[in-house]
Amino acid sequence: MALTELRIASRRSQLAMVQTNWVKAELEKAHPGLKITVEAMATQGDKILDVALAKIGDKGLFTKELEAQMLVDRADIAVHSLKDLPTNLPEGLMLGCITEREDPADALVVNAKNQAYKLETLPEGSVVGTSSLRRLAQLRHHYPHLIFKDVRGNVITRLEKLDSGDYDCLILAAAGLGRLGFSDRIHQLIPGEISLHAVGQGALGIECVEGKPEVLEAIKVLEHTPTSQRCLAERAFLRELEGGCQVPIGVNTRFEGDQLILTGMVASLDGKRLIRDQTSGEASEAEAIGIALANTLKGQGAGEILKEIFETVRPEA
């Protein structure tokens, strides 16, 4: 049966709506005549802004409300920043499509008085804003002389806090800045040697209901196979480590010929212990590559580090 209507669930933040509207426009181009509607809503992660993300909890912080709409048949798909989508999805839902990835790097953004500095030259005591334990742990490892403070709110709110002097610089995803039209605020792209990016960073994931082949077929036009292979390896790595979106686990993937090379990292919260390794294999074996690297890092002590973190960063009741 031909699909005549498609209902999209989305977060209502500015970045989420930019991403969802891009998906909507691309699907309308691919399927002329298809009626597409969007329902935007706030998630738990959007509502709680006075508590560090890791203290709120990790399971579906930015996705659960969208998934609930699909499970009661009020939406057919949900558009996510793939880095926010847990690796284990609710029964009845599936990751139907992964779009072409934007630059997955982390970016340094500075205020007017710090334009002369790069990350590696920031003076001792400079205040760096980040809400990510992954960024925090890696930057503490390389730059223990800097001060790190949590920063919450949407991208525009964070930039306002930076420019008002609350912070000397921020670490944000380059892809999100670009999608919002703030590429000119990127002062420095942070190399992977310093900060491996989050699993799925820079890509969009379209989640859908299982058992609706016409919906899956409609959204597959946005699938980007190289990105999908890279992200499937990254997500398998994260899942095998039993990590989540709010733990210090970083990755990088790249192709060399038909080989997919995955680099992965686990760090302690204080940055003093950082385990990093890489593995490779055929791109068609993406999940196996991720699982293999996770087990390699476990053998080097990653499991003990993560256990300590889970015991330290418990969600607040």
UniProtKB/Swiss-Prot annotation:
Q: What is its EC number?
A: 2.5.1.61
**Superkingdom:** Bacteria
Provide the family line: Belongs to the HMBS family.
Q: Which CDD domains match?
A: PBP2_HuPBGD_like
What's this protein's name? Porphobilinogen deaminase
SUPFAM superfamilies per UniProt: Periplasmic binding protein-like II, Porphobilinogen deaminase (hydroxymethylbilane synthase), C-terminal domain
Which Pfam family is one of those matched by this entry? Answer: Porphobil_deamC
GO BP field = chlorophyll biosynthetic process; protoporphyrinogen IX biosynthetic process
**Quaternary form?**
Monomer.
Spell out the reaction equation it catalyses. 4 porphobilinogen + H2O = hydroxymethylbilane + 4 NH4(+)
